[in-house]
From Swiss-Prot:
Residues 230-244 have a biased composition (Acidic residues). This is Small ribosomal subunit protein uS2. It comes from Lodderomyces elongisporus (strain ATCC 11503 / CBS 2605 / JCM 1781 / NBRC 1676 / NRRL YB-4239). It holds the Pfam family Ribosomal_S2. Its main location: cytoplasm.
Length: 261
């Protein structure tokens, strides 16, 4: 698929894709994913052609932008590394996020409280989100999926070849997809205008690590306050003032001077 010149992959975006290890695929290759393999390293890891990854991101964004009601787009991620990304994507584009376990019957059983009728489904991993893809096939909902080289492509209409197991890779793909959708909708003025949202916002963060860092920061501040208080007491300690006139006592220096006379 050839893109217009204005949609070409920029060097900055290519560097981001490489830095996030989007190009590192699995060692096994599913037959439908062979066209996306650039080459195979000596250790067996398949390198994904990021040019084709970008083409599929643009295609997926054009499909998403064509849906009149943005809430009719459902984004799913049972994989932990993709849950933060789909929530941020939904917040920026107006899509409906399904983060965590996909409840069976979400798309097929209208009796359930979580029943939805989306016009488009986007999943992070065809393996972990297999239930969402299966139900989409029952009700004829097109599916866009982030696929690794060994991912099954059954019932997937648009596959975005990438490393769908790394937290940085998953977050960056969702960020690029959201940015492209906003560009097509005209929310971002033109392709030369940078998006104010950083890719880091889409990266998975461990809640325990965040809590531990916050605790360490608080403990560090408390230690610094104690040390500062001790230093202030040591260097600015007040001395008791003595009024020699009222006490009737004379300093030792004056006594010595008087004895010489």
């Amino acid at each position: 698929m050839s893109l217009p010149a204005s949609f070409d992959l920029t060097p900055e975006d290519a560097k981001l894709l490489l830095a996030a290890n989007v190009h590192l695929g699995s060692k096994n290759v599913q037959v439908h994913n062979k066209p996306y393999v650039y080459k195979t390293r000596p250790d067996g890891v398949n390198i994904i052609n990021i040019g084709k990854t970008w083409e599929k991101i643009v295609l997926a964004a054009r499909i998403i932008a064509a849906v009149p009601n943005s809430s009719d787009v459902a984004v799913c991620s049972s994989r932990t590394f993709g849950q933060r990304a789909v929530l941020k994507f939904a917040a920026h584009t107006g899509a409906t996020a399904i983060a965590g376990r996909f409840t069976p019957g979400n798309f097929t059983n209208y009796i359930t409280r979580s029943f939805k009728e989306p016009r488009l489904v986007i999943v992070t991993d065809p393996r972990t989100d297999a239930q969402a893809i299966k139900e989409s096939s029952y009700v004829n909902i097109p599916v866009i999926a982030l696929t690794d080289m060994d991912s099954p492509s059954e019932y997937v209409d648009v596959a975005i070849p990438c490393n769908n197991k790394g937290k940085h890779s998953i977050g960056l793909i969702w960020w690029l997809l959201a940015r492209e959708v906003l560009r097509l909708r005209g929310i971002i003025a033109d392709r030369t205008t940078e998006w104010s949202v950083m890719p880091d916002l889409y990266f998975y963060r461990d809640p325990e690590e965040i809590e531990q860092n916050a605790t360490e920061d608080v403990q560090g501040e408390e230690v610094e306050e104690v040390q500062a208080a001790e230093a202030e007491t040591e260097w600015t300690g007040e001395t008791e003032e003595v009024d020699w006139a009222e006490s009737g006592a004379t300093p030792a220096a004056e006594d010595a001077a008087a004895s010489n006379w």
